[in-house]
């Protein structure tokens, strides 16, 4: 695997300013941690995206897709691969009656505002979820009683052979924090949402209420990756962590949030090792106290 050879091949078909060598992943994750990616490509077109995938295969370099990096922990040694970032360069939105077709790179917060402006309801739950639409459908993101599978009609997905196909809701296999996209390594290009006509003022009030609940109950002022753990059946992860005496627990620059124990926050120059050591401490303590095995919701990637 020769990263310089791959870099040269990529810059022949993709503008050089969109291909970054040894790019620090802390600049591309909401946790603000993570070592360098060998190569990062930020494609602006589907053709550039396909070229990046094709060349990664030809150069025997694996590729990894990110959006806003808001559900991601990258280890300190970084990533020995080509990271392909699908973000604001893919953020077109169109409306056809109550149907919304949005590209995968749009932030959920921006999409929510556009949907609200059309007086369409059903997407309010997603208004405060950090991250892109592509990331949200990949993990079937949800909050406050709603999740992506409630509003998704279908999506265009790209496979590693460069083929694009439309998948229906059923074919997407959206489950609790999972989907066929995640299982098969597909890439979401755009998503079709089926919503309902609503009253603008009511939609605005619901959105404001959810925003207020988030602001008062979640540590939005500090870098984090959102909820660290999946919800164990019959329990709430945050309550188990708090009742295990871990609220405010710190390892290096990583801390269990004082505001919401389900969050780990970066209180200053945290390393991925700090975060991962704290995750292990939490898992061990919760198991010792309640005999409940916590599973991480965040994706943990990179070289050990």
Swiss-Prot record:
Catalytic activity, EC: 1.3.1.98
Key words of the record: Cell cycle, Cell division, Cell shape, Cell wall biogenesis/degradation, Cytoplasm, FAD, Flavoprotein, NADP, Oxidoreductase, Peptidoglycan synthesis
InterPro entries from the UniProt entry: FAD-bd_PCMH, FAD-bd_PCMH-like_sf, FAD-bd_PCMH_sub1, FAD-bd_PCMH_sub2, MurB, MurB_C, MurB_C_sf, Oxid_FAD_bind_N
GO cellular component, as recorded: cytosol
Residues the record marks as active site: 177, 227 (proton donor), 297
Domain FAD-binding PCMH-type, chain residue ranges per copy: 33-213
Pathway(s) the chain acts in: Cell wall biogenesis; peptidoglycan biosynthesis
Location(s) in or outside the cell: Cytoplasm
Swiss-Prot/TrEMBL cofactor(s): FAD
EC class name: oxidoreductase
MF annotations from Gene Ontology: FAD binding; UDP-N-acetylmuramate dehydrogenase activity
GO BP annotation list: cell division; cell wall organization; peptidoglycan biosynthetic process; regulation of cell shape
Catalyzed chemical reaction(s): UDP-N-acetyl-alpha-D-muramate + NADP(+) = UDP-N-acetyl-3-O-(1-carboxyvinyl)-alpha-D-glucosamine + NADPH + H(+)
PROSITE patterns the record matches: FAD_PCMH
Record keyword Cell wall biogenesis/degradation present: yes
Function: Cell wall formation.
Family to which the UniProt record says this protein belongs: Belongs to the MurB family.
Protein name: UDP-N-acetylenolpyruvoylglucosamine reductase
Naturally occurring in which organism (per UniProt): Alkaliphilus oremlandii (strain OhILAs) (Clostridium oremlandii (strain OhILAs))
Taxonomic lineage: Bacteria, Bacillati, Bacillota, Clostridia, Peptostreptococcales
Gene: murB
